[in-house]
């Protein structure tokens, strides 16, 4: 009842938004004839006029109708493509800081040119964010023609570019790039040692393509820049052997601590927990391997890292599988994105998991890394002044977009009605029966010339289907993490006559599947080989194939398993039925599928048995459909709570990151003449704290504390301050006077040192000392924060709120880090002998770490 009410409420709201936009659409359409009469030069001059009006008080909203009409007319002349009204609607929604749900094939790339042009008029930069380098390069090269025609510049920000080329890309009016590159560039910019080395401008407006993948699917994996630390590969190799002496138990047999087994697996949470028996056995084994001392606890502070390594080894063996979660290529473990099926080159799991998997596979273990800088996509993209996005599937995650990013979701109507036939799910008892039915469906499609796209959830499943098709001599293409380079080409031709394409999850997003094959790809492929006459033959052949595919029923989608998220299922279905084309879809399931096995109710399994489903017989019933939907909703809610919890913890780190980067940027942006004042402030802060630490009374008397203060100043900072002699000589000394005496001595001592060593670039040296020291303590703080986060849940057993405890402890850790870094800066500047060589050493060390 509540779901129906919410659905109706959202539908009414969506309709109201679209209705309100119609006035603007009518205004844009009324300008079309006028703009058609303008020359190319006059159309281009509109950009200059818009910028002038913007600088003189007009708003972007006031310029919207004319700017959209300008882009539409320019597109007609450059591409021969006219923006449909629904694309204008999408452009307006994107400009209004919302998420536009636009079905596959509705022209999201062309739609994005409208808000990109309008917001680029501010000359503050527009970042269009794509999922991979191929899409960024493709869209930039295509749309550059349009934007250059209108007098705007376009940059491409992809992996492998030099800092110089990146800076050029960011200085363009509109920049195309990947989510990873934008995030990593932000982190790298906050690690540089001079302002000129930064590549990004102020983060103004980001428009995210496939926004659901970036802000939801990838939000759990933070961007991390790491540096190598101590090699502990022998420890991982030894701990990998512990798998042979530990055995699991069923979760329902016990709670976390009691049971006959050594550990149990929580598949829902993807975690492994040691039982009390397992803890004892593990400690005994570690003692035998000389990894811990006899009678030592695995939970003691000195062994907590080993504890994490043991759990990582168990997770590596029982929760992470080859050709599902990762592949082994060139003797390296490469992560497979669970949502897209794409490999994630260069990315490594944290918490020792990656090393544990390398040990499991018998590969060379790369040394563990220390985090130098990190940020989640959630917090990175919230740094932009303005954010919007588009995707074919967003409505199921509308609540999360609103709750976390303050983004409303609007469903954009299709240009032509969608006529795809979504057939009901078929559920089999076993996986073997399910795959037999899938193969039979593929055979029938091929026999009637119908193209088929088969979506799988893992490389393993895609290769299983491929092997079955090979035995039947059915030609097909496999698209998974192992064949990433062929992705766009294969998916573009998945609509050809009798084409059978097996794709892992949503590999190939961003490339349209055209019935009969992608004509643009075909023409580009044949352009170098054939004459104009031959090219006409290619077009004629395509038209024949296109019509035959339409008669066969269009692209048929086969889902081999329901994904944890309905949105991913909708993405697969959305590949068919584009722009009013015919098409069909069906999902095949079995009671052995992970979703149903882990999350469905026992009642559903019982009903399947009571019905007495025969071998190779499927069940299709509203009750089953509802049970599957309930299972998916359970997982979606769990994943949302997980992402929400991750964000709550990361928000604490994010606030500290914001303060730290602000202070760091103050140092970088300060003129050399101001660095001296910053040094004085640091000296003042540190030495006042030192005086307050030793001296409590207002009027000084001879005491042990005064001698300790003198010793501290002498030993740690080379400052000789004879306070005790003054007191012995009966000179009255107050605490306030003492602070002034100490600071005066400090300033004199430091000035003498500068004069003595005649350092040419003293201010640059000071700047580098401050930055290098701050960065060192920040790295150590990040490691401490991670250890705190990993163990904070244990506070719950003491009736304390782990989140509040994390906030409280991390706050004091941060203050201590800032205080310790200032103390170290002062110690280096006062105690260390300095020369021009020291300047070079610190500079080179900083560059090496970076």
Swiss-Prot record:
UniProt entry keywords in alphabetical sequence: ATP-binding, Cell membrane, Cytoplasm, Membrane, Nucleotide-binding, Protein transport, Translocase, Translocation, Transport
Subcellular location: Cell membrane; Cytoplasm
Any one cellular-component term (Gene Ontology): plasma membrane
Recorded topology in the membrane: Peripheral membrane protein
One GO MF term attached to the UniProt entry: ATP binding
Catalytic activity: ATP + H2O + cellular proteinSide 1 = ADP + phosphate + cellular proteinSide 2
InterPro entries referenced in this protein's UniProt entry, alphabetically: Helicase_ATP-bd (IPR014001), P-loop_NTPase (IPR027417), SecA (IPR000185), SecA_CS (IPR020937), SecA_DEAD (IPR011115), SecA_motor_DEAD (IPR014018), SecA_preprotein_X-link_dom (IPR011130), SecA_SF2_C (IPR044722)
GO BP term, pick one: intracellular protein transmembrane transport
Major location category of this protein: membrane
S-S bonds: none
Annotated positions binding ATP: 87, 105-109, 512
E.C. numbers: 7.4.2.8
Signal peptide: none
Record carries keyword Transport: yes
NCBIfam families the record matches: PRK12904.1, secA
Subunit composition and interactions: Monomer and homodimer. Part of the essential Sec protein translocation apparatus which comprises SecA, SecYEG and auxiliary proteins SecDF-YajC and YidC.
Described purpose of this protein according to its UniProt entry: Part of the Sec protein translocase complex. Interacts with the SecYEG preprotein conducting channel. Has a central role in coupling the hydrolysis of ATP to the transfer of proteins into and across the cell membrane, serving as an ATP-driven molecular motor driving the stepwise translocation of polypeptide chains across the membrane.
PANTHER family registered for this protein in UniProt: CHLOROPLAST PROTEIN-TRANSPORTING ATPASE, SECA INNER MEMBRANE COMPONENT OF SEC PROTEIN SECRETION SYSTEM
Record family assignment: Belongs to the SecA family.
Protein name (record): Protein translocase subunit SecA
Name of encoding gene: secA
